[in-house]
């Protein structure tokens, strides 16, 4: 500590580290340091308390101080011949000002292959008892250590450089700033003061906030809000009790009309970045509001987190400074609805009773990955999909039947098995455990069947409005022939078929084509045909001409080959549906270069309280 400040007092505090319910090693170390700092501040409320806690992490496993020689031996054998992380959490706290600043240091250490004799010889010296990971770098040196990547002082247990920087930030006076513009599409707001730019979070544009600086970058100073001194007129009270932690929503604290304004401005900026400058105001309509701003989602992918008594089900936390996204346990999810509140407790009880553990993608251990819930917002039917890394789970059928008793709307229960490392839901192997293989959803009078992998717009009521605009445009041309590319389950093509003489849908996945044909059949549609094939190839093979081409591509937009195929068709009217303003702008720029004129751009808010939007564009040639 003398490397940091000349005058200080050292005194130990005792905390119960078992009370720290964090599975991430970085968060564990930081939270333990915070507990130490707060405990010390009870005795010295006016002093600047500097507390630290060091852990060793092998993968996601946290290694603290060993209880005895046997545990120390197991730790060292685990670390032998592999890389591990030494993490020190740091907390600076002054109780009289209620100011807290945290940080951490991380160093990668690689051990040589350690023999049992070498480990026993070290343990005989009894230097391991109060050491995280059962060793001290100054005691084992090159005998154990092959390489160190990062701060050596951190491995010793006190990262002097990090602490010096944190003290410098802490001793700076707090700032009173007026948030003058939003940080959209990110959460928070921005401010300018004395020639410097600041990022404020949490904050909304119009807030006056007191902040402390937590990080200085070349272009912007990152701050943390201590107090909202004067709230913005656009600030509202979030409905969700988990808002601010959960990453599912970013803007529940912002009035809905203001959210729509931000999305309109964001869309215009993204289009201008693509070279589409000078678009008249009447071409880009204001964002069309969602019919419902809560309970609008018909599908949610929830994640498991924790272990044992801390097992939880929810959403990944909002991205922050710590490079790990834990699962925030949810009791409710207002953007989805009350079905989650009925399903989640029963699934968690089943998992705890069966002692099922959460899957760790780094080690491959554990079973539980995600829980997907799909709900027909117009029919009330519910599908539950338990995503696991292992196939054989005892009692799963009984659990599904119990869930049916508690939730009569449950139409089907699936198990999805995926062993991919990526933390996403991928449909590799599905097994129907109970009930029907699909649920049904309605758009106006049309019925659509939804299976586990089926793409269906997340906001049912907003989709009706967007699809209705397309149908009305097609209806203005008598006897129109329509080509739908990236048709998925044929929902849009079936919806607009009543206004066309013939509709052809194209999609690369055969299972999507099968669903599209089924949806057309159950609605008695005989003017729609569907073809399996890649958009980059199929249009050139189709006979006849089309009056309209509808493209509804994935987030990345049209590939160069697909774009070339679409432009080669030379149809008089092109309709583009996009969920990504950046790729939309790129493709629209190419279309205008090829001779198309943008007639109207209509953004729809399919995702209230998030930065996302859906955009419908009509082009003519």
Segments the model singles out, each with a brief description of its role:
Residues 173-242, 278, 320, 529, ...:
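Terminal RNA-binding accessory module
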Residues 53, 391-621:
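Rossmann-like S-adenosyl-L-methionine
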Residues 373, 379-389, 447-451:
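Short, aliphatic-rich beta-strand segments
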Residues 1-11:
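N-terminal G-site helix/loop of the GST-like fold
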Residues 17-21, 58-60, 250:
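A short acidic, helix-capping loop that chelates divalent metal ions and anchors anionic groups
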Residues 24-172:
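Anionic-ligand binding patches
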Residues 226-233, 237-238, 247-360, 378:
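Extended interfacial segments that mediate partner engagement and assembly in macromolecular machines
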């Amino acid at each position: 500590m003398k490397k940091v400040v000349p005058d200080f007092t050292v005194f130990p505090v005792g905390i119960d580290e078992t009370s720290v319910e964090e599975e991430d090693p970085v968060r564990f170390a930081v939270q333990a340091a915070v507990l130490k700092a707060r405990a010390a501040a009870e005795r010295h409320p006016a002093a600047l308390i500097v507390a630290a806690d060091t852990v060793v992490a092998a993968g996601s496993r946290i290694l603290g101080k060993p209880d005895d020689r046997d545990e120390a031996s197991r730790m060292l054998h685990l670390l032998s011949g592999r890389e591990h992380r030494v993490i020190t959490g740091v907390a600076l706290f002054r109780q009289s000002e209620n100011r807290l600043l945290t940080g951490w240091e991380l160093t990668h250490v690689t051990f040589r292959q350690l023999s049992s004799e070498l480990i026993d010889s070290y343990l005989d010296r009894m230097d391991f008892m109060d050491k995280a990971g059962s060793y001290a770098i100054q005691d084992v040196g090159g005998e154990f250590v092959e390489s160190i990547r990062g701060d050596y002082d951190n491995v010793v247990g006190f990262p002097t450089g990090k602490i010096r920087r944190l003290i410098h930030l802490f001793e700076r006076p707090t700032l009173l700033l007026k948030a003058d513009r939003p940080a959209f599409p990110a959460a928070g707001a921005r401010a300018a003061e004395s020639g410097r730019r600041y990022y404020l979070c949490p904050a909304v544009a119009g807030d006056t906030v007191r902040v402390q600086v937590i990080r200085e970058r070349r272009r912007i100073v990152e701050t943390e809000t201590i107090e909202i001194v004067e709230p913005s007129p656009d600030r509202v009270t979030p409905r969700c009790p988990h808002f601010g932690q959960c990453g599912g929503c970013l803007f529940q604290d912002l009035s809905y009309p203001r959210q729509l304004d931000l999305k309109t401005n964001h869309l215009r900026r993204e289009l201008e970045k693509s070279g589409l400058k000078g678009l008249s105001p009447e071409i880009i309509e204001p964002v069309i509001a969602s019919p419902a701003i809560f309970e609008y989602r018909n599908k949610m992918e929830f994640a498991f987190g924790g272990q044992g008594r801390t097992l939880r089900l929810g959403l990944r936390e909002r991205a922050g400074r710590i490079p790990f996204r834990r699962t925030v346990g949810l009791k409710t999810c207002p953007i989805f609805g009350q079905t989650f509140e009925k399903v989640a407790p029963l699934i968690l009880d089943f998992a705890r009773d069966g002692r099922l553990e959460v899957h760790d993608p780094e080690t491959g251990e554990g079973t539980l990955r995600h829980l997907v819930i799909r709900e027909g917002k117009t029919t009330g039917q519910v599908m539950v999909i338990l995503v696991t890394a292992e196939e054989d789970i005892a009692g799963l059928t009984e659990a599904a039947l119990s869930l049916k008793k508690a939730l009569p709307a449950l139409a089907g229960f699936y198990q999805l098995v995926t062993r991919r490392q990526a933390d996403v839901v991928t449909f590799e192997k599905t097994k129907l455990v109970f009930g029907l293989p699909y649920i049904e959803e309605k758009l106006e009078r049309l019925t659509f069947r939804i299976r586990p992998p089926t793409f269906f717009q997340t906001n049912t009521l907003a989709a009706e409005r967007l699809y209705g605009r397309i149908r009305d445009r097609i209806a203005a041309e008598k006897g129109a022939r329509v080509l739908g590319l990236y048709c998925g389950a044929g929902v849009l093509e079936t919806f607009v078929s009543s206004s066309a003489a013939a509709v052809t849908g194209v999609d690369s996945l055969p299972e999507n084509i099968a669903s599209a044909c089924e949806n057309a059949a159950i609605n008695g549609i005989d003017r729609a045909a569907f073809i399996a094939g890649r958009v980059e190839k199929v249009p050139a093979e189709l006979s006849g001409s089309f009056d309209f081409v509808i493209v509804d591509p994935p987030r990345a937009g049209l590939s160069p080959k697909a774009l070339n195929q679409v432009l080669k068709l030379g149809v008089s009217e092109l309709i583009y549906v996009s969920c990504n303003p950046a790729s939309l702008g790129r493709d629209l720029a190419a279309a205008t270069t090829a001779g198309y004129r943008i007639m109207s751009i209509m953004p729809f808010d399919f995702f209230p309280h998030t930065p996302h939007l859906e955009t419908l564009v009509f082009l003519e040639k």
